[in-house]
Amino acid sequence: YNAKREKSGITVCRGEIIPKGLYHLSVSVWIVNQQGQYLLSQRHPKKQYPLYWECTGGSVLSGETSFQGAIREVKEELGILLTPGSEKLIYQSRRENVQDFYDVWLFHKDIKIEEMRLQETEVVDVQWVNPDKLFEMFRLKHLHPLITYVDQLIG
C-alpha cells in the first residue's frame, strides 16, 4: 500500500524489507464476551516481546481484506471461528515505525477457554479479563507495547 492506503501492486514477502514509502496491512482482534470480559493471549517466550499479553493479530496476506485477515488470524492462533455480523472496526492508524496500516477489530463471542486450540508456536496461554484488569495490565506494561489505544477500547 502507498501512504494513501491504495494498493501499490507490489508484494513483499515475510522477512523482506518493505520499500520506503510503502506499507503492509496488520490487524488486531479483540474478542469480548457477554460478561464484558476481553480475551487476551500470552505470546510465546521465543517471540519478540516474550510472554507479553495481547489480543490476537498479525499481518494480512496478499489478496485478503483486513476483515478476512482478522478472521484467519483468530482461527490460526486460537482455533476460534468468528462469524460475520458481530464485528466492528474500532481503530485505524498508519504506523510509520513499523510501516503498516493497522486495523483493530472488535468481535462479540462467548467461548470457553478449554474449547480453544492454541497455536503452540505463537500462544502459550489465554485468559478473559474485565475492563479494570485490562487497564491495570496496560498501566503496568504487561500488554504488548504496540497496544497504545486501550483507553479507546474500553472507553
Describe each region flagged by the PLM:
Residues 142-155:
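Charged phosphate-binding loop/patch that engages nucleotide di/tri-phosphates or the phosphate backbone
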Residues 15, 57-58:
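Short helix/strand-bridging catalytic loops that position acidic/His residues to coordinate divalent metals
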Residues 26-57:
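A glycine-rich, hydrophobic loop/mini-helix early in the fold
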Residues 60-145:
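Unchanged
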Residues 1-28, 34:
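Acidic, metal-coordinating catalytic segment for phosphate/diphosphate chemistry
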Residues 4, 33-36, 44, 108-113, ...:
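Short loop segments at secondary-structure junctions
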Residues 19-21, 49-54, 127:
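A short, polar/proline- and glycine-enriched secondary-structure boundary/capping micro-motif
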